[in-house]
Amino acid sequence: LVQKWVGLSLFGQNLPQRLLILDGKPNTGKSTLVLILQALIGEENVCQLRTECLAERFELNRFRGKTLLIGCDVPGDFLMKRGASVLKSLVGGDPLSVEAKGLNNAFQVKGDFNVVITCNSRLRVRLDGDAGAWKRRLLIVRYDAPPPQKRIQHFDGVLLKEEGSGMLNWALLGFARLKEDLRETGDF
């Protein structure tokens, strides 16, 4: 699942309209995976996701030109925040009106962003009677393995330096596998 999702992120459009949640014990590799993903995609294509700001007037403008939105080490109530329901539109292919400071006219963006969220606890979701839509969009991977005995500083950089081309090939294979899944089942 993670391989396919990383491949999807390289593609840049969220075809299956899903968001990835990596939750579980600290020091188990969740943030390392996200740092590697950012490096593969390019920092210029990534933006921090702030659910508490999603309902604000100019927040969506921050996502213009981005393909990956990340919420790293978020609190357990991250999906309970006032603007969290906008996430469904950000990944669901919906047209979104965006306002930018200093511009008189709003413009449209398509909500096909890839979204990954990491958390050391299980996230709680404000359903607002829309449990089906949330269930359809959430992909959850639990990190329950014990942390390593010895931490390697800047492990993401070490892995990218030593295994970068292999990781890119792994992600591309994941995207090929996802495309096959989408042809066969329409989903992961």
Summary of predicted features, one role per range:
Residues 1-28, 32-188:
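Feature primarily recognizes SF3-like P-loop helicase cores of small DNA viruses
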